[in-house]
Amino acid sequence: GNGTVVYPEFGGIAGENALAGIIFGCTSKLNVNLTIAPMKSRVGGIAGLNIGTISKCVSTGTIRVTQTNGNEYPVYVGGIAGEIQKFGGMGGVLKECLHAGKITVTAANNRVGQMCGTAADNVLSSSYGLSGHVLNCYGKSGEGNLVGGTDASIGTGGLLTEAQMKDSKSYVGWEFGTDWKISEDGLPERVENPEITSLEVKNNWTSCYVGEKPWYWGRLLINGTTYSEITADMISGFDSSAEGTTHVYVEYKGK
């Protein structure tokens, strides 16, 4: 007969982050212990499958995955995402993320990475390559590669020793003081309420069809030094029910 096969996707925050999805500023300390049936599977500390953007997220938990009798079926396991994919010319981005946990996989056909277990062919073969999709991301020395299943190079980020992880200077491209700080346990964490002295929207006008939303809202310049992507939850006053020009309001941390 006819049927649909749904591949399981597990994540500390979401099973799948779709093309328009942005997972921003999340920390997962979740310990995952999974026994998976023999079928293609994706497991990540933040998302099982990422087709959108995961930005400024930290995963510190332990991920244990076991698959028995699954020689023909791949298991993709990552500290942040099990797999990253593009759709058309967009998505599949991991930016400014850290994995500081441990990953253990028992499976005959597995791909494991501290950022993602695997990157889809359309990511590796894109004009930006892997370096354009995994940006300023860091993992722990001795715990495997950042991206599994490929020898493709990454231009930014890398693996850090325990001592380097506790040093803010190790995280090139991260804004400490306004956006990040080193926590009491020695790892980076987001600054919840930094003193905000100025906010500036950096974007030209954008457009969308009636009844839809723009896929990109622009960026905020915070205190004249730090950029942050504007996400849909920051927007108010948006109305696309009719043609015309509209102004929206952006709220960032109560400002």
Where are these regions (language model features)?
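Short, intrinsically disordered, charge-balanced linker/junction segments flanking boundaries
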Residues: 1-2, 199-201, 250-255
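Short, recurring structural edge motifs at helix starts
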Residues: 12, 45, 79, 203-207, ...
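Predominantly extracellular beta-rich ligand-binding scaffolds that present long acidic/polar faces
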Residues: 1-195
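Solvent-exposed, low-complexity, repeat-rich "mucin-like" stalks and linkers
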Residues: 195-226
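Serine/threonine-rich, repeat-prone extracellular segments and beta-strand-based repeat modules
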Residues: 205, 223-255
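Secondary-structure transition/turn motif
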Residues: 191-194, 221, 253-254
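N-terminal start and proteolytic maturation junction detector
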Residues: 108, 150-153, 168, 206, ...
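Short, low-complexity cationic-aromatic patches
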Residues: 17-18, 209-214, 241
